[in-house]
Amino acid sequence: MTNTHSYKNVAWIDMISPTEDDISNIVKRYSLHPLVGEELRSNNTLAKLCVYDEYALIVLTVPTRVNDEGSYKIVDREIDFILGKNFMITSRTTAIDSIEYFAKILDTNNMLGKDERIEHAGHLFYFLMKRLYQGMIDDIENIKDALVRAESQIFKGNERKMVEVLSMISRELIDFRQTTRIHRDVWEEMLQSFDKSFFGRDFTPYVKSIKDEFNKINELLLNTKELLVDLRETNDSLLDTKQNEIVRILTLASFIFLPLTFVASLFTIPGIDVPMTTEKWHWFAIVGIMIIISVFTVFKFKKMNWM
């Protein structure tokens, strides 16, 4: 599917799962290099920047947080950008909410004639990247909210359940960072390459602004990771305390019942005439002795601060 948006003299061709004919037509229409066409056909390209005489190819992978049967996971979405002086081509395999939202805003502003800031395709790319990065910031904030909810559950005594929850959130953060870390190289290379490109030096502040947005995402990821580490340490500490308490109780119970078991076994040895087993009241005497031993053991444990 191909959607075309325009603002003033700038055209934006947005392709979703383009066919071979779509790609061939775009390559021919804008006189693109055959290697650019190959990039549009490929869906597994690492983030990179290639600058040609009249246009530039930018490949980025954007992490998106999606709901998968009640749990969340990070899914990578590759976007290919081709930037010319007066055109921008985007190619992707699936719909991305941030891009759909940006397209609606652009069409609305175009009809109302509100936005005077778009003078060439570089400005269009800048505002689209701002929208994409804002969507990523929203996803990280949602992950942070999940950590806050986990924190509440930890202090409600649900430490064992939170082990899996924290592990899932940790996986999200790892996937998010793995996908975005290479963006920095693209923006740094763009700052060097675009200084003498068809957009001119005036576009450099826009690239710096995009890089600043990336740095904001990186900083937010680091802060969220620190919160995760702190919560995991707290959860593990509380879980260890509970487990140690259970072990302590079981150990004390064993010490209490061990002498009782020993006393009871003395009166059940076969083949030996054991006294105090011939009369009915003897049974009550044995039980009384066992109770006295239990009370003494408990008293001793409390005196030693074991209970």
Residue map of PLM features:
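Peripheral, non-transmembrane regulatory/ligand-interaction domains of membrane transport proteins
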Residues: M1-Q192, F198-F199, S209, E213-K216, ...
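Hydrophobic alpha-helical transmembrane segments and their immediately adjacent juxtamembrane loops
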Residues: N25, S31, D212-M307
